[in-house]
Amino acid sequence: MDVFMKGLSMAKEGVVAAAEKTKQGVTEAAEKTKEGVLYVGSKTREGVVQGVASVAEKTKEQASHLGGAVFSGAGNIAAATGLVKREEFPTDLKPEEVAQEAAEEPLIEPLMEPEGESYEDPPQEEYQEYEPEA
């Protein structure tokens, strides 16, 4: 019986040791997972910020080009329709500079709402059922 009890005691110690190792392993795995998730999240955020900045810069460049074309086109239309004589049209203005100045002016209203706020649907009028007169 003594041998049997000693064997059970050893088995119990083995189970306790295994449980401790498992607990330690799970804790380490959870910590590594957390680190991995935080790393991926930070890299994703950096990528999004870079992407937004890149898109904003390209949009600004395109607006500058478009503004220059519109400015030149407006001058040509004004001259062609006789509103302005070609000689009277200012030649010292460069369309690219005018478009660049327009692109750099601050907006009166922000394009996006402050963080944490969302657009809400406008209130809908209640539906009234229409009954035709007999």
Curated annotation (Swiss-Prot):
Non-amyloid component of senile plaques found in Alzheimer disease. Could act as a regulator of SNCA aggregation process. Protects neurons from staurosporine and 6-hydroxy dopamine (6OHDA)-stimulated caspase activation in a p53/TP53-dependent manner. Contributes to restore the SNCA anti-apoptotic function abolished by 6OHDA. Not found in the Lewy bodies associated with Parkinson disease. The keyword Cytoplasm applies. PANTHER family: BETA-SYNUCLEIN (PTHR13820:SF4), SYNUCLEIN (PTHR13820). Coiled coil: none annotated. Keywords: Cytoplasm, Phosphoprotein, Repeat. Belongs to the synuclein family. The keyword Cytoplasm applies. Gene3D superfamilies: Helix hairpin bin. Its main location: cytoplasm. The modification Phosphoserine is found at residue 118. It comes from Homo sapiens. Residues 98-134 have a biased composition (Acidic residues). Residues 89-134 are annotated as: Disordered. Sequence repeats lie at residues 20-30, 31-41, 42-56, 57-67. Residues 20-67 are annotated as: 4 X 11 AA tandem repeats of [EGS]-K-T-K-[EQ]-[GQ]-V-X(4). This is Beta-synuclein. It comes from the Eukaryota. InterPro entries: Synuclein, Synuclein_beta. SUPFAM superfamilies: Synuclein. Signal peptide: none annotated. Phosphorylated. Phosphorylation by G-protein coupled receptor kinases (GRK) is more efficient than phosphorylation by CK1, CK2 and CaM-kinase II.
